């Protein structure tokens, strides 16, 4: 298992926490060079939006340039389209790829498997439009990261060509809440066991927490595309990421785990700031490098 520890100073951690507190009250402005193009109904009936920086071409040239599908977080229950557009913009800015932000259905009105079905449908719609799987990268954060991992399991089981790579930040991979870090990091994170229990109850609505694909750690890991997992060392979900990365590695998969020292859940929100924080610069650089190195190989199933 390849693990990289990303160092941070106490000032870095404090700056990230401060940024997270101000995002709702003083949201950043979407940069003027951002291009937004709604794509419903061309994503299998799932709402979505192309977000591109510097007018990177989407649509007809996507098969040539490659695209990223971005799946937002929010505990399977919440969405903030403005902040999600900025997150998608940052991804496009750093990678040179158009980014498709997926507006999946939310719990509790639409519990499992609605959100997962939407992510899978959006991915398959790009294949139907002629975008090769080998030119697609899946990216998700928090609940969106969980959905990305679940989608990979569903797609592989169905024999659908898998994407070139996936990038996930702070996934919840074990909905049984069995990871030791849930208690070990209690009080050091912005999330705790009670929050996780609420999230899984709303999302699962009676579905079993010890089964895949809803709980990705309980799946089969052979044949997955290269994975980059990113997580903060103070997160209660630290071991969810560690355990999943270890399981994929043990199954012979290509996986890299980045652990950001001193960082809490949702630390990736630092990339939304108009003044880039050091952790944000590092995270975006790592993501960009990973995506640029994703093998353009034969479509894998």
Model regions and ranges:
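Catalytic active-site module of serine/aspartate enzymes centered on a nucleophile-bearing elbow/loop
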Residues: 272-301
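Catalytic histidine neighborhood in serine/cysteine hydrolases
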Residues: 249-266
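Catalytic nucleophile-loop/oxyanion-hole region of alpha/beta-hydrolase
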Residues: 80-81, 87, 100-135, 275-278
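Short beta-strand/loop motif that positions the catalytic acidic residue
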Residues: 229-231
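Short beta-strand element of the alpha/beta-hydrolase
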Residues: 64-74
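Gly/Ala-rich beta-loop-alpha elbow adjacent to hydrolase catalytic centers
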Residues: 140, 144, 148
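A glycine/proline-hinged amphipathic helix-loop "lid/cap" segment
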Residues: 1-60, 285, 296-301
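Hydrolase active-site cap/lid region
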Residues: 153-207
């Amino acid at each position: 298992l390849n693990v990289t520890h990303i160092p941070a100073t106490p000032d870095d951690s404090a700056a990230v926490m401060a940024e997270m507190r101000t995002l709702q009250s003083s949201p950043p402005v979407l940069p003027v060079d951002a291009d937004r193009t709604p794509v419903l109904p061309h994503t299998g009936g799932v709402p979505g939006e192309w977000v591109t920086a510097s007018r990177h071409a989407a649509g007809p040239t996507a098969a040539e340039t490659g695209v990223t599908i971005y799946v937002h977080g929010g505990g399977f229950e919440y969405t903030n389209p403005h902040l999600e557009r900025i997150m998608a913009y940052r991804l496009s800015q750093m990678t040179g790829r158009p980014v498709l932000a997926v507006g999946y259905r939310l719990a509790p009105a639409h519990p499992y498997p609605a959100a997962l079905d939407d992510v899978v449908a959006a991915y398959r719609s790009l294949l139907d439009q002629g975008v090769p799987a080998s030119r697609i990268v899946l990216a998700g954060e928090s609940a969106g990261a969980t959905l990305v991992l679940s989608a990979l399991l569903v797609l592989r089981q169905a024999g659908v060509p898998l994407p070139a790579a996936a990038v996930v930040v702070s996934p919840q991979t074990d909905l049984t809440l069995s990871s030791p870090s849930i208690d070990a990091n209690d009080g050091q994170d912005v999330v705790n066991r009670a929050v996780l229990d609420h999230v899984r109850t709303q999302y699962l609505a009676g579905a079993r927490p010890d089964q895949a694909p809803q709980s990705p750690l309980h799946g089969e890991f052979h044949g997955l595309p290269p994975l980059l997992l990113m997580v903060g060392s103070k997160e209660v979900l630290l071991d969810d990421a560690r355990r999943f990365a270890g399981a994929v590695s043990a199954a012979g998969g290509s996986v890299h785990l980045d652990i950001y020292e001193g960082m809490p859940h949702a630390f990736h929100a630092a990339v939304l700031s108009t003044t880039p924080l050091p952790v944000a610069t590092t995270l975006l650089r790592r993501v960009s490098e990973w995506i640029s190195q994703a093998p353009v190989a034969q479509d894998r199933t």
